[in-house]
Amino acid sequence: MKIAWIGVGVMGKSMALNLKKAGHLVYVYNRTLSKCEGLEDDGIKVCSTIKECVNDADAIFTIVGYPKDVEEVYLSDYGIFANAKEGSYIVDMTTSSPALAKKLSEIGTKFHVLDAPVSGGDIGAKNASLSIMVGGEKEDFEYLLPVFEAMGKNIIYLGKAGSGQNCKACNQIAIAGTIAAAAEAMHYAESVGLDGNTVLNAISKGAAGSWQMDNNAPKMLNSDYEPGFFIKHFIKDLKIARDTMESKNEELPVLNKVLELYENIADNGLENEGTQAIIEYYK
């Protein structure tokens, strides 16, 4: 299959490489072309415009930063809908607004449009072990399932357009609570004079265990803030979930508190660090 890939950031680059390894013909575009460096050595064609990337593709995948970037990539005169061939499969894997996912599906009637945000960070992207949450027409999901399987292990169809994004919001809400709790537990341990790593070994295999405890708590203890997922993007995700619920006149108090913590450390210059840098709030 000829695949166009737009967005080669922390996760997108590895995902495009995994599609190439699976035998697909992959074309990529990124607004900052320097991020595509080295991809041509792996047999991936680097394009200078969206039009060049998508105009003859069978399937088009996007994973960009913010909903405004999604709108530009899809709806501008130089974007996907204006330049993709009719009948192509178009999948947005950005964590974005459920309302925008529905809008793209409604506008893109000449195409097979899916929303398919992912979870698993840079490690999951590299290892092709991502969780992929898909919304849209079920037959379109089934057609692209072998392609999704080149990037992930836990691939779930959720329902109509926007359902993938709503599921991803659930994912980010759950992460917000667990990563904040892990940081607070590590802070407590060190504040009362315990060795953080010893405490982590004691509690991580019981009821307190979680992916965040296994993967991010050790990084917190080592002040290793290399981003598997940027704080600035997590703030964006939490705001999407908050705004969706506020539109229903409902509140998410735990999410709102964690969002406040992340906005605090972002304001102190840490927006480009990994989400584990939440521990810095306590320092």
Question: Which residues does each PLM region occupy?
Answer:
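Rossmann-like NAD(P)(H) cofactor-binding subdomain of soluble oxidoreductases
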Residues: 50-55, 59, 67-130
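Active-site-proximal catalytic alpha-helix in oxidoreductases
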Residues: 128-135, 160-192, 204-215, 233
